[in-house]
Amino acid sequence: MDGSIKVAVVQADRRRGAVAQAFGLIADDVRDRVSATGAAVVAPTLDELGRGWASTDRDTLSATIDALLASGAGSIDVTAGRGDHASFDRLGYRAETSGRAVSYHDLSAASDDAWTAIETPGGPLRVASRVVAAGCRVSLSIARTHGVFRLGLGLPSLATVVHPDDRRRLEPAPIPSVIPARAVSASSLLESWRGWLVRGWLGLRSLDGGMMLTGPERRRLERIERSTDLLSALASSALPTISVVDGFLGMHGEGPRLGKPLRLGTVIAGTDPVAVDAVAAAIMGFDPLDVAYLRRAQAAGLGVADLAAITIVGEPWSQVRRKCRRHASDRLLRLVSGPDDGGTVAVPSPHFRSRRARAKARAAARKSLES
């Protein structure tokens, strides 16, 4: 086990105390990262539908900023690209951090020269220059399921610092990108019903061990493969230095937009963002190595997704694990490929086999029994 890869897991009754305790458990690692630059850029999660419970809580932001200042940060920039400038006030960020050396930047109103184009397999992707140039990047994400990446943890939350026009390539949405506030509840209910139908239909079709993929399903997987490639390229250029996953109140089901609240009461933090996402995935009931973006990140050397190579400080993840409701399309999403590192990383077997493949499998089984 590589003892240098530490991830803090804290379960508590109060969010602010849990975040502070998590930073205390990895204080030396945080101090090393922050003191090297003397400044930090913090990227909170802002819910594009304007819901406070689905955004980074002000206590999480405030406790994080206090920990960064105590670790040697002379200045902190809070940067987000979803919502609008008023979101910082509406969510209580400015009031909570008043008097501290903190500046706020709304990327949704940023000029063209505020973006840096990074090269990806799918073409240039515009990322906030402030984030790309930062020596210490801090990701504040929510524990939630995701309709593209299976889980919307620290690395997928980097979408918030991508240009709005390019973000659509990273997170292709099957529903309108803008929903009026008065329609959010109805849309969430409709999406839940649709999720039940999709979940049941996929489950029924895979009863015999597999099924033929339809044309739309194949095309959807191809789009998700491209999005996963983009996410890998984005993470390579803007990898968080410190990652915090807030699971006090997360989201499950039809995340990251129309899911339902999930109360875990847990905070996960560390200086290896891949390891933090892996531990958060395990707490939510997922095998980290079954999540394509985590396998790819590990293969690219961005971090460690193998739980056996991660030292947990605080609560053992197995003691705070809670099974969440997965996205309705999860049976499809787990088919997204991901290269391993040549070792024992397991790529999940397909749920969906052709009729001919199933017939061959049954024939082989009968032959084995007869022999």
Name each model feature, range by range:
Residues D2-S371:
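Extended, low-polarity segments enriched in aliphatic/aromatic residues
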